[in-house]
């Protein structure tokens, strides 16, 4: 699998997830077998102006090569300046977000709103490619709504502008994350362009990811919500790519090790930020607040998870989390396996 000059060891990537795909989570997913991982969405305006909060999104592991930064803005000129700033900070690949359905983002003309105008898409890609000097990818949706499905036209415009790959989430902006993703549209985009196509949408399990590849012919699959609380999905996919047996689900001890390592990594990540270097205790509290959603996801479908989640909103330190894990999921405890019925009832909707 290749994008520009970069060859990847597999075809299953961690998608750019706002508020999720930070350095610690990317590291865990890569450790499990993700062939590649994007950052979460970063404001091109903030990058261009060097704001402290925006720069915190650029924290990365040295082995992240290429370091791929996803940017968003409404104006091609701002996207270009943001891309140049990202490259100056170490990015080796830039992705333009043209898929975010959030009202605030679309209301500014960014995200999915930008993809309503294929000519603007082509211009934006061309300017970002020229400014950054690195491969450019774009993430798009099927269209704005059912009456304006334009993903093939937009993908062709991105290709004409110089994009090295196009990622398609097979839902419209109007759908948000509801309903069913159209894998047929992923296949249509794959058949319409020569550049690499990445499929996204309704990839909850390793079986889903493998089926998307078979049914659409896409070059790679972006795993998004399916990785939340389950980075082991990438271990299963790596085994499948190698023709190896499916590995067993994580044991309780392995699960707890990953959860608590994630906690420690998140705390370290925040303590590296300039605003918290002189206040490690506040950095830890902030990190734990950020991690609460991950704690909910890690326990989704597990017996005991309901009681764990009721208390997770009160934790403030890494030690609090460790005690909570031991109390509700004690070592050697039985019934740790995921209950499919519980998992379905607690499906991630956001």
What function would you assign to each model-found segment?
Residues 4, 8, 12-13, 18, ...:
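Alpha/beta catalytic cores of nucleotide-metabolism and tRNA/nucleoside-modifying enzymes
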Residues 31, 80-110, 118-197:
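Alpha/beta enzyme core
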Residues 2, 17-92:
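Glycine-rich, positively charged N-terminal anion/phosphate-binding segment
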Residues 17-19, 42-44, 72-74, 99-101, ...:
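Active-site beta-loop-alpha junctions enriched in small/polar residues
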Residues 38, 68-70, 95, 137, ...:
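Conserved beta-strand positions in the central sheet of alpha/beta enzyme cores
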Residues 1-12, 45-68, 100, 105-108, ...:
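N-terminal small/glycine-rich loop or linker at the start of catalytic domains
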Residues 115:
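Aromatic- and acidic-residue-enriched carbohydrate-binding clefts of CAZyme catalytic domains
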